[in-house]
Swiss-Prot record:
This is Ubiquitin-conjugating enzyme E2-21 kDa. The gene is PEX4. GO terms for biological process: peroxisome organization; protein ubiquitination. Residues 3-182 form the UBC core domain. The keyword Ligase does not apply.
Length: 188
């Protein structure tokens, strides 16, 4: 087992333990789920909840995580799972008892609306081996509440904040959450 696999296994055990404990601090971070996919430790799936007192509050988003072989020296590639409108309509037609409803578009200045790519310095040049997958997800949740409109991937959302039109920004976020939420897909 490589040092990367050992590190990922250690992180997984820690997160799994915290997620099963009812009073664990992880529940306050916005992380709902984080686990490796069945094909090994180098592809993970996560679900986060939007931060309290933000336009994203109480909505859920799914993320996909690709781990490089030299992790933690290099950062993971984390992006929001986004689907096209047809796929979302198919998911919206499904009803599933017990399944989570997640939003498959992320209307945020620092997230590419079509690809789910995230512009966050700790996922690029400011990455340090001290970061974990869990702490990277917490940073993403914090970014949702504290967008950086000066380094946008979604110019339309950034312009609303640059113009100080927070009402339109919040309304647009709520619109997208309502329009693009569906029962969770197991595709990713």
């Amino acid at each position: 087992m490589s040092s990367t696999e050992k590190r990922l296994l250690k992180e997984y055990r820690a997160v799994k333990k915290e997620l099963t404990e009812k009073r664990s601090p992880i529940h306050d971070t916005g992380i709902v789920d984080l686990h490796p996919l069945e094909d090994g430790l180098f592809r993970w799936s996560a679900v986060i909840r939007g931060p309290d007192q933000s336009p994203f509050e109480d909505a859920l988003w799914k993320l996909e995580i690709d781990i490089p072989t030299n992790y933690p020296l290099d950062p993971p590639k984390i992006k929001f799972v986004v689907f096209g409108e047809e796929k979302i309509r198919q998911l919206q037609r499904k009803t599933s008892s017990g399944a989570r409803k997640v939003c498959y578009k992320m209307p945020h200045p620092n997230v590419n609306f079509k690809t789910g790519e995230i512009c966050l310095d700790i996922l690029q040049q400011k990455w340090s081996p001290a970061w974990t997958l869990q702490s990277a997800l917490v940073a993403i949740v914090v970014l949702l509440a504290n967008p950086e409109p000066l380094s946008p991937l979604n110019i339309d959302m950034a312009n609303l904040l640059k113009c100080d039109d927070t009402t339109a920004y919040k309304d647009l976020v709520h619109y997208y959450i309502a329009k693009y939420s569906a029962y969770e897909s197991n595709d990713v």
